[in-house]
Amino acid sequence: MASKSRNPKAYCYEHPRPALTVDIVLFHRSGSVLLIKRANEPFKGLWAFPGGFVDQDESLEAAVARELEEETGLKGIRLEQIGAFGDPGRDPRGHTVSIVFGGVVDRSIQVRAADDAADAAWHSATRPPKLAFDHKKILKLALKRLADSAKQ
C-alpha cells in the first residue's frame, strides 16, 4: 500500500500554537553539568543547556541527538525524558514548550562548541554560572530526579 503524503494545509488551526523545543541536561558523575555559552540572542553570552527547536517531521529523540551533536559534538549518549516546561514567558521570542531530556555519563568526555554555541564546558551542577531562559528551574528538577534515582 502506497503511503499518503501529508498535506500541511489539509488541517488549519484557528489558534496560534507554541513552538516545540528540546533541552538536554547531561551530568557527569563528578557532579558537573554540561552547559553551552549562547552565541546568539536571546541571552547571548549566558550559559544554557544544549538544545533547540524541533524540526518539522522530526521526532523528539532525533531532535535531541541532533542538537547535542550540533552544539557539543557528542553522539550516542543515553538520555531519557525528565520533564516539560511551558511557561508562556520562558522565551522572549514567543511561547515555547521544551521537552527536557537528561542523562549521566561516568567517563571523561571531551566536548567542543559548534553551531550556535560559543563555548561548551562542564560546570558545577550545584553552583552553575548564571543560566539563560528558565534553565535554573530545569536544573533544579533534574538534580531532584538524579537524587531520587540514586535512592532506588
Enumerate the language-model features and the residues they cover.
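Residues that recognize and position ribonucleotide moieties
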Residues: 18, 47, 121
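Exposed loop/turn and edge beta-strand positions of beta-sandwich/beta-sheet ligand-binding modules
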Residues: 20, 43, 95
